[in-house]
Amino acid sequence: MLAARGKEVLEKTAKELSEKYKVKVLPVLCDVSQQKDLENLVTVAIKEFEKIDALINSAGISSQHPFQDQPLEDIPRLMYTNYFGPVMLSRLIINHFIENKGGAIINITSGSTLVDPPPRNFIVYTSLKQALKAFDKGLFWEVRDFGIKVTSIMPGVTDTALTGGLKDISVDKSRLMKTEAIEDAVKFALSVPANVCPLEISVINQRTPWTRPVIPYKQAHPKE
């Protein structure tokens, strides 16, 4: 089952996947920032498929601003989409996994969580992704004995519509990751033996995709 806000892209993608893999793909309109949409999503999934094996949270938005210029309306949007949505959806589905003695939750966080301190102009975005990564790790320790896997995938800068709105990104597309790299990471997380759980998977650009440092030199080396 696929869920997204955009009806046209959602239905197109569902059709492509159904034809490619010869399986039933059900598209469901959903805004991950809305609890009622998330509740409906889980209800429909169980009704249509009876058993859910995996939850993959890949919805996300970005906002690139110095904190003093951060649009106020962006902060709740980032919080609800990048943190509230995945956490709430995990809560709505976790008892189904417990009853079935297994399942997998995969959250797409961000490669920016590997940078310390958080990249300039992305501190709200990155701090929420760090919170989600911490949630994933804590959740695994709580539910591991139910046979439930929880994985954070931390991708670098990927060639998507989201990236297209960022500043200081290289025009050399070969420096940007393709979505297939993240797809491969998800497949790996789902293919490991039942007695193994990959807690974190980092998939980072081989060559820098940025045209300027994401952390100023003085910030990274305060004692020099």
Where are the regions a protein language model picked out?
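Substrate-binding pocket helix/loop in short-chain dehydrogenase/reductase
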Residues: 66-67, 74-76
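C-terminal helical subdomain
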Residues: 146-148, 152-153, 168-212
